[in-house]
Amino acid sequence: MAKCLIVYASKYGSTKEVAQAVADGLGADIASAAVDPDVRPYDLVVIGSPIYGGDYLEPIKDFLRANKPYLAKRKVAAFITAAAHWQRDVGLTGEEDELLFTQQDYADGLAKLAGGDCMDCRGFGGRLVPQDLDDADRGMLEWFYRFLMHEPLQGFDLLDLPSAYRWGEELRETLAG
């Protein structure tokens, strides 16, 4: 049986919940990127990060930089969570010719940063509780929703933990091959 590890960064808890659901479905160990877990005993490392301000959290980027040589020798998978319910591509200016990003684009990008032999990557919805946000995140998300999503900032819960669990099961089945 392959040994698997989920490494995640989470700011408000949604990504941690998704990471736990994937770990449960996969039968994997789980660790925060902030503790810099040792990936060497593992055959598969799944990386997870939320998207904030169009980027991954620093702890996951730091983890990936520090472990690049080890990850290059392993199977990897990646997932992101996003506090946006994207029904369409999202860009920064609204111009037709600009580069647009979807949840899947961000998940693919995280997998590329991880290196290694990528098995799969996924984008999952997140949870947004406006009253829990710090001032910087509230300001950034109010701008994002007003100018890019063309709607007011509202709370929502798009976590789909059963889908995250099923994805973990799919990864396990693929590994068992």
Regions found by a protein language model. Give the residues of each.
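The conserved SAM/SAH-binding core of class I Rossmann-like methyltransferase domains
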Residues: 7, 31-33, 79
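Short acidic low-complexity segments
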Residues: 29-40
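FMN-binding flavodoxin-like domain, especially the glycine-rich phosphate-binding loop
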Residues: 25-29, 44, 52-177
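Short, charge-patterned binding micro-sites
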Residues: 48
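Gly/Ser/Thr-rich loops at beta-strand to alpha-helix junctions
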Residues: 11-13, 51-54
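N-terminal beta1-alpha1 ligand-phosphate binding loop
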Residues: 2-26
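Generic anion/oxyanion-binding catalytic loop in active/binding sites
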Residues: 4, 34, 153
